[in-house]
From Swiss-Prot:
Pfam families in the cross-refs: Med4
Record has Chloroplast as a keyword: no
Main location: nucleus
Gene designation per UniProt: Med4
Family to which this protein belongs: Belongs to the Mediator complex subunit 4 family.
GO molecular function: nuclear thyroid hormone receptor binding; transcription coactivator activity
Phosphoserine PTM positions: 32
InterPro entries xref list: Mediator_Med4 (IPR019258)
SUBUNIT field: Component of the Mediator complex, which is composed of MED1, MED4, MED6, MED7, MED8, MED9, MED10, MED11, MED12, MED13, MED13L, MED14, MED15, MED16, MED17, MED18, MED19, MED20, MED21, MED22, MED23, MED24, MED25, MED26, MED27, MED29, MED30, MED31, CCNC, CDK8 and CDC2L6/CDK11. The MED12, MED13, CCNC and CDK8 subunits form a distinct module termed the CDK8 module. Mediator containing the CDK8 module is less active than Mediator lacking this module in supporting transcriptional activation.
Region (Disordered): 1-21, 227-270
Keyword hit for Isomerase: no
Keywords annotated in UniProt: Acetylation, Activator, Coiled coil, Nucleus, Phosphoprotein, Transcription, Transcription regulation
Protein name as it appears in the record: Mediator of RNA polymerase II transcription subunit 4
């Protein structure tokens, strides 16, 4: 009788525990099923031990405990399948979380690139607007191409394309001699027999003084006085600084006659 009463109490307890186990999570339900299996197994073993010692037949109670044990084992197997499925789902969730993190990193990288592109586009738009303003301003104060070409020709006619190292903007000197200045320079006078000396030689009085005539003197401030000696023709040496050969009274008279003729011709032309 004691065994039957304890079996009934155990059935009631198992029923209450089974009802409560259905309300928890899968982990709690598995733990509850394991506890039930442990209790039922212990109860069945105790009943078998008592029946063997007392040699009493308690088949009905043993069958009930065994049925409960089999039922709880079936529940446990179902819970195990559910736990395995949930484990697979959990692994899939972890894989999806990693994929989400990767996509999130890609989105952040794209966002950074989009911000850089936005900044570049904003700069380009600003520059385009400024250029449009400049174009509009140029259209309002437009100058014909013919006037620009004329102005360029006027600049090129009076100035060279490059300048000496000492030349700076605003310098009153011209960068390089013009065509007119070249013709009135040393080379131009040497090629012009009417203004040069006899047989293309320099006047004797100028050479005797060790200087060039005023007509052939350097026309530019950056040319030194030493250039007057270096620019002498090749057939003249430094002996001219002392006294050129053939320098006599007759030569001086010839020079005076030539200068008188040139002055008279210039006065007649006036």
């Amino acid at each position: 009788m004691a065994a039957s009463s304890s079996g009934e109490k155990e059935k009631e307890r198992m029923g209450g525990v089974s009802g409560m186990a259905g309300l928890g999570s899968t982990r709690e339900r598995l733990l509850s099923a394991l506890e039930d299996l442990e209790v039922l197994s212990r109860e069945l073993i105790e009943m078998l031990a008592i029946s063997r010692n007392q040699k009493l037949l308690q088949l009905e109670e043993e069958n009930q405990v065994l049925e409960l044990l089999i039922h709880r084992d079936g529940d446990f197997q179902e819970l195990m399948k559910l736990a395995l499925n949930q484990g697979k789902v959990h692994h899939e969730m972890q894989a999806l979380e990693k994929e989400v993190e990767k996509r999130d990193s890609d989105i952040q990288q794209l966002q950074k690139q989009l911000k850089e592109a936005e900044q570049i586009l904003a700069t380009a738009v600003y520059q385009a607007k400024e250029k449009l303003k400049s174009i509009e301003k140029a259209r309002k104060g437009a100058i014909s191409s013919e006037e620009i070409i004329k102005y360029a020709h006027r600049i090129s006619a009076s100035n060279a394309v490059c300048a000496p190292l000492t030349w700076v903007p605003g310098d009153p000197r011209r960068p390089y001699p013009t065509d007119l200045e070249m013709r009135s320079g040393l080379l131009g006078q040497m090629n012009n027999p009417s203004t040069s000396g006899v047989n293309g030689h320099l006047p004797g009085d100028a050479l005797a003084a060790g200087r060039l005539p005023d007509v052939l003197a350097p026309q530019y401030p950056w040319q030194s006085n030493d250039m007057s000696v270096n620019m002498l023709p090749p057939n003249h040496s430094s002996d001219f600084l002392l006294e050129p050969p053939g320098h006599n009274k007759e030569n001086e008279d010839d020079v005076e006659v030539m200068s008188t003729d040139s002055s008279s011709s210039s006065s007649d032309s006036d």
